[in-house]
Amino acid sequence: MASNSGIQWYFDDFEVGQVLQTGSRTVSEAEIIAFATQFDPQPFHVDHDAGAASIFGGVIASGWHTCSMMMRLVVDAFLSQSASMGSPGIEEIRWIKPVRAGDTISVQLTVREVRPSRSKPDRGVILLLWEASNQHGEPVATIKGLGMFGCRPAPSSL
Amino acid sequence: MASNSGIQWYFDDFEVGQVLQTGSRTVSEAEIIAFATQFDPQPFHVDHDAGAASIFGGVIASGWHTCSMMMRLVVDAFLSQSASMGSPGIEEIRWIKPVRAGDTISVQLTVREVRPSRSKPDRGVILLLWEASNQHGEPVATIKGLGMFGCRPAPSSL
């Protein structure tokens, strides 16, 4: 199929131990507050003064905002050029250190498991470890995420 | 502390087996596309026609959008009236069924574990099962989430 020409990552292209590095993304206080106002309006996420007075000593990003920013980095790094068929879920998230206004985060991806589908030979599931760090090299969050990917079409169908 | 008067949920108030029901939230195609354009711009999340042509048969919400909507329901249901000290992480997410434009979701919360902190006697961690379902009663996603909560202040400090 000629329309597959933009796809660089099929299920077949993943190997345990592979490492990929995403680009980076800086988050502003306005973005932190805008996300949290919609989805996680706890005082330490949406209010400058309440954040400063909290145990965190300043506004911090909602953990869901951190995960969503990590997702965008992962989409831009490879998922948008992959045969992604969505995700059945996440095995674990750890929010290690707050993400604060002005922080710049990037993600390192490591392939942990490669599982061909038992019932559908045209696809398989990849377990990826996502490790986000900030501009100081400090870990801020990890995700162990599952992704389903289509297999590379057989040569006869090209 | 008089400023604690708005808090109805301290660590002490959780018991294994407790069930809480959130309100509900309806999501539009415009909201699905707006979220995904920022954080998860895969074709089946951001483009009406690409969604229709995909294995999903229509635009579906990013899994991170579904989790973020669930978070807002949980904040409104009880977290905003709790002694929440944030979350160390998530034990598992399962995206069971796509959330589509026009769907209305609500969440049932069940307390699974109550773990007093070993090192800090003023707090503890709760493991909650979040079960989201749509307007047809179909499960769409589950989250096993950790939350840290402060203990109720001793009477002598009131």
What are these regions (language model features)?
Chain A
Residues 2-89, 154-158:
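Hot-dog-fold acyl-thioester-processing enzymes
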Residues 1-15, 95-104, 108-158:
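HotDog/MaoC-like acyl-thioester-processing domains
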